[in-house]
A protein has these predicted regions:
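Short acidic-glycine loop/turn motifs at beta-strand connectors
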Residues: 110, 239-240, 315-320, 419-423
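A generic structural signal for residues embedded in beta-strands
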Residues: 144, 630, 684-686
């Protein structure tokens, strides 16, 4: 009787269950060689089918590298984890990583405890004991850390690390965005003190070792509200060429010599590495360098002697560079321009590009070129108009040549805000790059490309010295194929094979063809996604988007750390120094790329917050818009007047049962057959403005 019972004792065991029993057994006996007969006996496998199943399990585990067969029928665990162990370890590591992060949210205090309401889906809301609130009250915005995450618990336990202030206040919300992305909003006291110790005096010795451009016509062109002037241009006609009709110009691209003041390895330098870049939120700049340096000592302010690192070009009327050299210089800017002031000159003299919309100067401001006195016209100020017009013509030639070579023309409109002194958004507008912007852009690109080529281009067989390059790899062929297939939905074509220049030409034609169409935003977005992200690396692969074989960042050391690295290395190599440590600089390049991406995310979050804030007092109002995106979750709509974007959730479109047509990017109603297609005009009502989520919800306005 017992014999019969044993014979069928494990006939109901299943293979997954047996596999786990075998894994557990070998895990307990790691380091031991196990005979299968002992294994059968221990696991109670006394039937032939059970033993055969066990042998199958052992074979599987050998294939998975969990076991190794030391000799026939004798096995040992390899030490490699099982799939279950790997998943558990990954989950533990992920949990550990989450516990090291800082979380931002709004506090909700109850009788005996509190919750931090976060928008982080991985951790949800944090349970905060009363004794860990640090004085926070309901409605406060705070930062917090996780201190415990009990197994199986829905909410991790946290503690408040800083009370930022009341939710909804501009200063608090901007600090919250910075904290959300791990970005600093104040400078450590010791760094500020170190900056205050730096002298702004320029000594005779400083001047003696530099080329002196203080008597050469020099100016800056920047946004109206800028304070950190990284770059200046100087201009003079130096001589006529061989023919009487040919002219030669000396154009200096002068960049703030930050490396003169910030020494490598100093406390200021270490903080700059940590930040990597200045961060531009809607209402403020969070600078990479302390204010004394970025806005005062290094900033190329007018009528002040400033130390610069410069690329000096000799260029003819065809914008061909005949000679150039790199030099440490001293300059004295004659005039600080806003972009609008320079653009107004181009428009007044008929030199603006046809596509540029007319520029409006602030109320009461007269064009600078119409206000010069006779006395001023006899000074360098009187030569500014001619210099700017000449530089504009040269910049257009440089730009035209760049696009003929294969540069890709991605110019996406950017939403900007008019804000009051308290940071409240009063209105929105679209930032558009015009000729004045492009003038500066082209000469900065020329300087960046030139210094990169001077280090990177070496004779065959020689190795180039280490330099951080700004690289942009060629787009992935599979993504281009997907883009080509995608645009056929709208009647467009994209040939994605050929040389890089041919592909770029085809991309530019596509972008030109969709300009002004209802599908423009979506096609541009999908095309951008087909592109690789530009980044920093010491391994040069060129810059696809700009069509440059060599490119770096040299022109903005006040606000970008890679530019400061490039300045130091150029100075080192000019003095005959050896090539820098590649591992060190590649690590700094990786960190700079990460910091750049983080800053961009914070900047976008601040724009989204201000859009929602701008619409918060317009709940219930009706607006005209364009469908800017169609998904299975609903419709994205961009309002015509404010350019704010929100969503009509599919769950709220209850007048019909709508299905998502992915092929044609539209929602269509099964009963009434109404269709909503990308680019369609639409009327919406503002339904919700959730500042915590930075989210606008619209409701569809149905026509009666």
């Amino acid at each position: 009787m017992s014999k019969g019972k044993n014979r069928g004792g494990n006939r109901h065991i299943r293979k997954p269950q047996l596999a786990q029993m075998v894994i557990d057994y070998f895990t307990r006996h790691t380091g031991e060689v196990i005979d299968v007969r002992n294994l059968f006996r221990t696991l109670g496998l006394n039937t032939h089918p059970g033993k055969l199943m066990c042998m199958d399990v052992l074979d599987d585990l050998v294939e998975q590298d969990f076991l190794i067969e030391r000799e026939p029928l004798r096995y040992e665990r390899t030490g490699l984890p099982t799939e279950r162990e790997r998943r558990q370890k990954e989950a533990e590591e992920r949990r550990k990583l989450l516990m090291e992060k800082t979380y931002v949210g709004r506090i909700n205090v109850r009788k005996d405890f509190a919750f931090l309401l976060t928008e982080n889906r991985e951790v949800g809301d944090l349970f905060i004991p009363k004794n860990q609130l640090k004085g926070a009250q309901t409605g406060d915005k705070v930062t917090a850390r996780i201190v415990d995450w009990p197994e199986g618990s829905k909410n991790p336990v946290g503690r408040v690390t800083e009370v930022l202030g009341r939710s909804g206040e501009n200063e608090v919300e901007m600090h919250a965005i910075l904290a959300e992305f791990g970005l600093p909003y104040t400078y450590p006291k010791n760094v500020e003190e170190a900056a205050n110790q730096i002298s702004d005096k320029i000594t005779p010795a400083d001047i003696a070792e530099r080329e002196d451009f203080r008597d050469v016509l020099t100016f800056t062109i920047d946004p109206r509200d800028a304070k950190d002037f990284d770059d200046a241009l100087s201009f003079r006609e130096i001589k006529s060429g061989k023919s009487s009709n040919s002219k030669l110009f000396e154009i200096g691209v002068h960049i703030a010599d930050v490396s003169h003041y910030v020494t490598e390895g100093s406390i200021i330098d270490k903080e700059a590495i940590r930040r990597g870049t200045s961060v531009y939120l809607v209402d403020r700049t969070v600078p990479m360098l302390p204010e004394r340096l970025c806005n005062y000592i290094c900033s190329l302010r007018p009528d002040e002697d400033k130390l610069t690192y410069s690329v000096i070009f000799e260029m003819n009327e065809k914008a061909e560079v005949k000679r150039w050299h790199l030099a440490h210089t001293i300059i004295r800017s004659d005039r600080r321009f806003a972009y609008e002031e320079v653009q107004a000159l181009f428009e007044a003299r008929g030199e603006a590009s046809p596509e540029d919309t007319p520029t409006t100067l602030p109320d009461g401001e007269k064009p600078w070129f119409d206000t010069l006195t006779e006395e001023q016209k006899a000074t360098p100020l009187g030569k500014l108009e001619g210099a700017l017009l000449c530089l504009n013509r040269l910049a257009k030639l440089l730009r035209e040549r760049r696009f003929l070579k294969g540069a890709v023309d991605f110019e996406r409109p950017e939403v900007r805000f008019d804000i009051d002194e308290k940071g409240k958004p009063l209105g929105t507008y679209i930032k558009v790059a015009k000729d004045a912007n492009k003038l500066i852009e082209e000469f900065m690109l020329l300087a960046n490309r030139t210094v990169a080529e001077s280090i990177g281009r070496v004779p065959k067989g020689k190795k180039a010295k280490v330099l951080p390059y700004r690289i942009h790899e060629q787009p992935d062929q599979d993504k281009l194929a997907n883009l080509s297939q995608f645009v056929t939905k709208f009647g467009h074509k994209l040939k994605y094979t050929g040389t890089p220049a041919e592909i770029s030409k085809n991309l530019n034609k596509l972008l030109h063809d969709v300009h002004g169409s209802k599908e423009q935003n979506l096609v541009e977005m999908v095309a951008l996604r087909a592109m690789m992200k530009a980044r920093y690396s010491i391994v040069n692969v060129g810059h696809y988007g700009l069509a440059f074989d060599y490119y770096t960042h040299f022109t903005s050391p006040i606000r970008r750390y890679p530019d400061l690295m490039v300045h130091r290395l150029l100075s080192r190599y000019a003095e005959g120094g050896r090539s820098a440590n590649p591992e060190k600089y590649e690590a700094l390049c990786d960190l700079s790329s990460e910091n750049e991406q983080t800053a961009a995310l914070a900047e976008r979050a601040s724009i989204k917050y201000k859009q929602v804030e701008f619409m918060a007092d317009k709940i219930g109002k009706i607006f005209e818009g364009i469908i800017s995106g169609v998904t299975e979750f609903g419709l994205y709509v961009e309002l015509n007047d404010s350019h704010c974007e929100g969503m009509i959730p599919l769950r709220d479109m209850d007048d019909d049962y709508y299905e998502f047509d992915e092929r044609n990017y539209q929602l269509w109603g099964k009963r009434h057959h109404r269709r909503f297609t990308l680019g369609d005009p639409i009327r919406v009502r503002v339904a919700k403005a959730n500042l915590d989520k930075k989210q606008l919800d619209f409701a569809l306005v149905t026509e009666k």
